[in-house]
Amino acid sequence: MNVKLYALIVASSCLFCCIAEGADLKQSFAEPPLKYATRPLWFWNNTAVTEEGIVEQMQAARDKCGYGGFGILPFGKGFKPAYLTEDYFKLYGAALSKAKELDMTMCIYDEYGFPSGSAGAIHGDGVRRFANKHPKGTIKRLDKHEEEVTGPCDWSKKLPAGRVMSIVGMEMKGKKRVDLTGMIKDGKVAWRVPKGTWKMMIFVCVVDGDPNVDYLDPEAVVKFVEMTHQQYYNRFKEYFGNTIDGTFFDEPTMYRAKGRMWTGRFNDKFKARHGFDPAPYYPALWYDIGTKTQAARNYLFGFRAELYATGFPKVIQEWCDKHGIAATGHQDQEEVVNPVSVSGDLMKCFKYQGIPGVDKIGGRAAERFYKVISSSAYNWDKALVMSETYGAMGDISWETIYHVAMEQYTKGVNQLIPHAVWYDNKKVSFKPELSWRHKKYAEGLQLYNKYMSRLNLMLQNDGRHVADIAVLYPIATLQAGHYLDGKLGHYKGGVAIPEADYVDVGEMLSTELGRDFTFIHPEVLDEKCSMKGDTLRLNNPVNHESYRVMIIPGHKTINWSNLKKIKAFYDNGGKVIATGTLPRKSAEFGHDEDVVRTIEALFPTSEKAAGESGRASASGGMAIFLKRPTAKALRDALDGMQRVYDVEFEEGKELCYIHKVKDGKHIYFLANLGKTRVNTSVALRGTLQPELWNPHTGGISRPEYSHGKRGTVDVTKVRIDLMPTRSTFIIAPQEE
């Protein structure tokens, strides 16, 4: 099944097509059906689970909390019955039977504990089920063995254990490299070292010892899926595509194996993809190898990110497509600015996954990265964006619960999975316990689920996202500046990239200026974007977007192919803003001079200390460089480039928002995430007949509004009055 069809069979997605069959949208908004409610993770935690307990808790979850289903998460050493045994599946079957009776839906959580990939070894019962059965299918690590020698001399070395990936000698002063990989004989490598100081390096791929599946190897992942997902299908086929509508994976990551995750067939697959041998470039994974460092790292780290994306998530997605259900899940440590040895590429890792996801957990600033994940969905034309939300945040207030949800939905999330309900509420490991048994939450959960159901009704759809601003996702500069064994440690990404201001720029746009945007992946800019007049178009069948401004956040290295297209956009009348640091290097071999020349053509005074510079093209294009980007500088630059944006707020009265277009309707969701009341006039491009739909109450009203023009552009001004942590929809038919 094509992944674009996944949402049609997912009850939790609640696409508009699900409403259309005779149902009245306004009536559904007032009293949303159960299928739009949230479905929390349900921890079967550190206790013996019984059929009686399952039935009782599911009934209460629906009747007392308004939940629409669950994702069952076996957890802890005390959980019984044993994972993946027939007794376990008997209980799971009881849960499915009760869910069907209650008209609830279920999502298969693919692990015992977390992260996904070991079948119980971590946060489960400690049994390494996958590793015990498939020891060669577990995570691999790239090791480097090195020594310095002074030539001329004879050098020889017995090969260390593991699969040899590369052997290179590098002269330390001039960075000359000699590939010795083909000189292996009888388990040794020998070479006559020329004059100079040389670093002799042997790179080997070894089994790490981590119990998780090799995320980079699709064949290994197939074996994991056979051990887990397939076992549910073998027993519960009749529930697939109805009661069971999806799977969920949790926290795979490449920071395992000391951040040096690798796989044995890396070189062979690299050659097949790129047409040249990566072995001579392996030293760049750790060291500066001269002028080719940045491009070499982009090829090597970029290909590892591709293997990661086509490994674990893609294999699971393909299995789900075949079995009529959806697939979602999220990475670990999404909050790391440099993801190269964590998720590899926080946009591309979701390229082949039907529903990209994120985890709002503890005090981590996941909200700064929601737009990266939702932009991945927009880039690759996906309807849904999931968030596992509230875990380990403690007994948070209702205000915080709503605030988090509003921020997520204004930034593109549209499938919130609460964390969590606990089978044994006396053994809660990660608060809050969001159930009828908790005094703080019991009375408010029904109201909360009605609110979330209304958000889902309106936003869980394949409507087209509208944004005037594109921001280039700077994976090229992140990969170019990255190296293995960085001083930050693998858990925090290893290496800080000083020019990487993309997260700050994104937050300025979203939370300070009230300007929505889409991160554009370099691959998508090359393959799916074209120019139409002075706009840049993202050419997706469903989520097609038109950008009037392109922002290049801080880069030292950029894809030459991207820069050529951005320059053509500027020449055609497009508007370009660059921030912080301008690129001087190409992510492709042989194009550094092209990058320098083009940047100078766009920003001729780019290195002046004044901080702002640029020029205009003959066709009306503008290019501005903000050396020290602030919210004010960014606002001034944007206002000078475009007369009217899609949505505009009065300065100092900005709200967070998202705008989608679906079935002839404009759907604007606005939220006040500040601490003071906002009474303001919101300017919407076009001549609209707006209504206010209140997700807190289900009420619908006609606001105060007026029509006017800015220059030749039609504008509708709508009066909005929102208290802190309150939200509203503006719904309007598309103008003729």
Q: What role is predicted for each listed range?
A:
Residues 1-5:
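Positively charged n-region of N-terminal signal peptides that target proteins for export
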Residues 7-17:
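Bacterial N-terminal signal peptides
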Residues 20-22:
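Boundary at the C-terminal end of the N-terminal hydrophobic targeting segment
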Residues 30-46:
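Boundary/entry segment of secreted carbohydrate-active catalytic domains
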Residues 36-39, 50-55, 68-70, 83-121, ...:
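Carbohydrate-binding surfaces of carbohydrate-active enzymes
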Residues 74-84:
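Glycine-rich, proline-tolerant flexible connector loops at the mouths of alpha/beta enzymes
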Residues 144-184:
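Extended, Lys/Arg-enriched charged tracts that mediate electrostatic binding to polyanionic substrates
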Residues 173-235, 711-736:
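Extended acidic/polar, glycine-enriched regions
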